[in-house]
Design a protein with these regions (language model features):
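N-terminal basic, Ser/Thr-rich segments that initiate or prime the first beta/alpha elements at protein or domain
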Residues: 1-456
Length: 456
């Protein structure tokens, strides 16, 4: 059994954690403009950096990994004492391979192993060479006769939103420049192309609020650009025992999940998804909850969905029972919304130039409050065709979830008020200590879940 070394990028974690140690004193001296002290701090930081590099070198040469013929992975540590951690391929729930752009330049890959039932703190993350990472994944979770699919829903949705955001952000930047530099200038030709609504906004929007909106739109555009780059060359595959996906342009990502270890599948409905009529589907296996969806399907084209996850059942399109329901749904967004609204109303008479600026957080929390109202009417539990299904609201996202794993722990908690009106909070705990909480549901609905767990 041959032992292999980790990639040198494995030391980046140590360097990143110690970065603050020699940057904070340097910044303090720099602001004081004491150049003699600055040179002394630079010398100290250089010595500290060399010590950290030496420590990283020791860590790299004291650690190694090996893989035997039976598919058992072992991570070794040999410095002062010997420590080995062993993971069998049969005990894995999922495996991910990440190759950020700077990793690709150095030929490195970040591999994360998710053992069955282990929490996220017990996952194993390695930095390996690209060929070693691919070989390790093929040995632990081999792909045999996969069926490939290349859904275009996510790529088109991200591209459409990115285009709309780019146009709106450009208009906001032009408005901000116009508010900052009043009078005819070289931007007049550009503003001639802005429609009546943009001109109206330019008249009433202060410069500070315009720049704030433009910066917010720019950050949203970066997020959408990242989403689009991640969905390029995206493909989904499945075998008799596994399901997975891979893709990306600058940053590459691959996920392999055992089908029998999927805890639940989650269809997330957001305002953008409703607008584009494309629904992202996420899966969770053990403590593995990938940031990217497994696939995105379009309304009316559910064939791929049924092929990849035939056991999935969508929660029924029903309104939840709201009689005697707790108003805790509205607290997280309602309190800051009321505060911002009060400040906006006060500024209208005391400081009118801040009114429009204060409207921005007011509208933001107002949108969250609208999401809370949707959760108040839609969140609930249902048994459908032998599957536990639930719907829960988080911010602007409505999660439609189907439980697929038999090992689920149900916990019902009641306050005295909830007990008096027959309501309870139900928490579902899955392998890997992943928890889902459904708030203020009827006690009789929760009891149906308990009886279902006892008989199945």
């Amino acid at each position: 059994m041959t032992e292999h070394r980790l990639h040198p990028f494995a030391a980046l974690r140590v360097l990143r954690k110690t970065l603050v140690l020699y940057l904070v004193p340097l910044l303090r001296v720099l602001f004081e403009r004491n150049w003699a002290a600055l040179r002394a701090a630079l010398r100290q930081d250089l010595i500290l950096f060399l010590l950290v590099c030496a420590l990283s070198w020791v860590i790299l040469h004291a650690s190694s990994w090996s893989l035997d013929e039976s598919g058992t992975f072992c991570l070794h540590w040999k410095l002062l004492f010997r420590f080995d951690r062993t993971v069998r391929g049969a005990s894995l729930a999922a495996l991910t391979i990440e190759r950020p752009f700077y990793y690709r330049l150095a030929g490195a890959s970040r591999v994360t192993l998710y053992p069955v039932g282990e929490p996220k703190q017990r996952t194993l993350t390695l930095c390996l060479r690209r060929a070693d990472a691919q070989h390790l994944a093929d040995q632990l979770l081999p792909i045999e006769a996969p069926s490939l699919h290349r859904p275009k829903g996510g790529e088109r949705a991200a591209l459409g939103l990115l285009g709309a955001n780019s146009l709106s952000t450009l208009a906001l930047f032009l408005l901000a420049i116009r508010q900052t530099q009043q009078g005819p200038d070289r931007y007049e030709l550009a503003f001639a192309q802005i429609n009546f609504l943009a001109g109206l906004a330019a008249r009433w929007l202060p410069a500070g609020a315009a720049w704030l909106l433009a910066f917010s739109g720019f950050l949203l555009g970066l997020s959408l650009l990242r989403s689009f780059v991640q969905t390029v060359h995206y493909e989904v595959w499945h075998t008799s025992t596994q399901i997975g996906s891979r893709g990306g342009w600058l940053d590459r990502f691959e996920c392999r999940v055992k089908s029998d270890q999927i805890s639940f599948a989650d269809v997330r409905l957001s305002p953008f998804a409703r607008l584009m009529r494309r629904w992202p589907v996420f899966v969770t296996a053990g403590s593995c909850s990938p940031e990217l969806p497994l696939f995105v399907y379009r309304s009316g084209e559910e064939a791929l969905f049924r092929e990849l996850l035939p056991e999935f059942r969508m929660p029924p399109d029903l309104l939840a029972r709201t009689e005697q329901r707790s108003l805790i749904f509205f607290a997280p967004a309602g309190i800051p919304f009321a505060l911002c609204l009060l400040l906006t109303l006060v500024s209208a008479t005391v400081l009118p130039q801040l009114t429009v600026t204060l409207l921005i957080p007011t509208l933001f929390f107002g949108a969250l409050l609208a999401g809370a109202a949707a959760g108040y009417r839609r969140e609930g539990l249902w048994l459908r065709e032998g599957r536990m299904t639930l719907r829960r609201q988080q911010g602007l996202y409505l999660h439609c979830i189907c439980v697929l794993h038999p090992d689920v722990c149900l916990t019902a908690t009641q306050s005295p008020w909830a007990a008096s009106v027959g309501r309870t909070n139900l928490t579902l705990t899955f392998p890997g200590w992943v928890k889902l909480k459904v708030r203020s549901v009827p006690l009789r609905d929760a009891e149906k879940f308990f009886k279902f767990m006892e008989t199945n």
